[in-house]
Amino acid sequence: MITGKLITVEGPDGAGKTTVLEQLIPLLKQKVAQDILTTREPGGVAISEHIRELILDINHTAMDPKTELLLYIAARRQHLVEKVLPALEAGQLVFIDRFIDSSVAYQGAGRGLIKADIQWLNEFATDGLEPDLTLYFDVPSEIGLARINANQQREVNRLDLETIEIHQRVRKGYLALAKEHPKRIVTIDATKPLKEVVSVALEHVLALLLA
C-alpha cells in the first residue's frame, strides 16, 4: 500500500531542474521529518542505468523513435518496481527527475509519435501510478540550449544534438500537458534567478505536504 508521496521534476533541456532539485532537498529536509528519496529517469537502478547509456550514446543516431520510446518505458518499469514503489510503500517522499510526462513531451511532441500510444505504454509500465505533484520548469528553447552549450562540465549526449525545432516542439508539448493537468502540474519560470526558482518550488512542495 502506498503511503508516501511522489513528486516529479520536468522540463526541457537546459531548464536547470536537476540543479534546482539539488538545492531544494536540503531546504526541505529542514522543514519535514519524512524520509526523502531522490532518483532519476532513465536510470536510478542498475538495469535502467544500462538502458540510459544505450539511449544517450551519441553514436546511436540511427535509433528509431519507437525504439527510443520503448527503451524509456522499459527503464521506467524496472526503476519503478525496484526502487520507487518500495520507497512509496515505506511512506517516503520520492522525487524523480523526469517521469511519464517526459515521454509525452519528447517522444510525442518532439518525435511525433501518437500521444495515445505513449499514454497506454506509460499506464502499462506504471500500473496507472501518477505523481501527486509535478514541478515543470519552463524555459525558452534558445535559453535552454545556450545554457547547455555554456556548461563545459556537462557531458554532451545524443539528445543535445537535436535541432532547435525539436526542442521547441518538446517545450510546446510540456506546456500543453500543463494546461491539460493544471491540478497536478505546476509551471515555474526557470529563467528567474536560481534562488527564486528554488523558493517557488519549495512553496509548492510544502503546500502539498501540509495540505
From Swiss-Prot:
Pfam families named in the record: Thymidylate_kin
Which residues does the annotation say bind ATP? 11-18
Q: What is its EC number?
A: 2.7.4.9
A single MF term (Gene Ontology): dTMP kinase activity
Enzyme class name: transferase
Q: Give a short account of what the protein does.
A: Phosphorylation of dTMP to form dTDP in both de novo and salvage pathways of dTTP synthesis.
Q: What is this protein called?
A: Thymidylate kinase
Q: Identify the species of origin.
A: Streptococcus pyogenes serotype M1
Q: Which gene encodes it?
A: tmk
